[in-house]
Swiss-Prot record:
Record CDD domains: Ubl_UBL4A_like
Gene Ontology cellular component annotations, sorted alphabetically: BAT3 complex; cytosol
Biological process annotations from GO: post-translational protein targeting to endoplasmic reticulum membrane; tail-anchored membrane protein insertion into ER membrane
Assembly, per entry: Component of the BAT3 complex.
Functional description taken from the UniProt entry: Component of the BAT3 complex, a multiprotein complex involved in the post-translational delivery of tail-anchored (TA) membrane proteins to the endoplasmic reticulum membrane. TA membrane proteins, also named type II transmembrane proteins, contain a single C-terminal transmembrane region.
Protein name in the entry: Ubiquitin-like protein 4A-A
Classification via PROSITE patterns: UBIQUITIN_1, UBIQUITIN_2
Chain ranges of the Ubiquitin-like domain: 1-76
UniProt-listed SMART domains: UBQ
Organism classification: Eukaryota, Metazoa, Chordata, Craniata, Vertebrata
Record's subcellular location: Cytoplasm, Cytosol
InterPro entries on file: Ubiquitin-like_dom, Ubiquitin-like_domsf, Ubiquitin_CS, Ubiquitin_dom, Ubl4_C_TUGS, UBL4A-like, Ubl_UBL4A-like
Length: 154
């Protein structure tokens, strides 16, 4: 199938792939055509960021789909998940969770529970769309704004 990749500013390109290709492979093809290093690419489909390790079929991307390309400046960290997993605050949360789980479960069960929680957390982050992130940021940055729906906070 042929996908169209459109940078926010610049000329689009087409890449020939199968639905079983990984997003990282698409980035390599785009890198060859547009001379943008794969490490600086962030591909979006219908507003959602695509994770390198996932296949196109995981996102139901079909023939003649159009992907948007955001080019990150060199040296910038990759995505929300990359920043969150390397953050000491998140590391501290996982350490605290490990301590709490150890009090209530056997070591093997605690490890299984924590592993599943980490997977669920990372999956949830990957599924956030740019719209979701903008809404969340707006609510966190302007919690007292009138006209803003805060019923979810109850």
């Amino acid at each position: 199938m042929i996908l169209t990749v459109k940078p926010l500013q610049g000329k689009e390109c087409n890449v020939q792939v199968t639905e079983d290709e990984k997003v990282s492979t698409v980035k390599e093809l785009v890198s060859e055509r547009l001379n943008i290093p794969a490490s600086q690419q962030r591909l979006l489909y219908k507003g959602k960021a695509l994770a390198d390790e996932h296949r196109l079929s995981d996102y139901s991307i079909g023939p003649e789909a159009k992907l948007n390309l955001v080019v990150r400046p060199a040296g910038e960290r990759s995505g929300v998940a990359g920043m969150a997993s390397s953050s000491s605050a998140v590391g501290g949360v996982w350490q605290t969770l490990s301590t709490v789980l150890a009090k209530h479960f056997s070591p093997a069960d605690a490890a299984k529970v924590q592993e599943q929680l980490v997977k669920d957390y990372e999956r949830s982050l990957r599924q956030l769309s740019m719209d979701d992130i903008e809404r969340l940021a707006g609510r966190l940055l302007h919690p007292d704004s009138e006209g803003m729906d805060t019923s979810y906070m109850d």
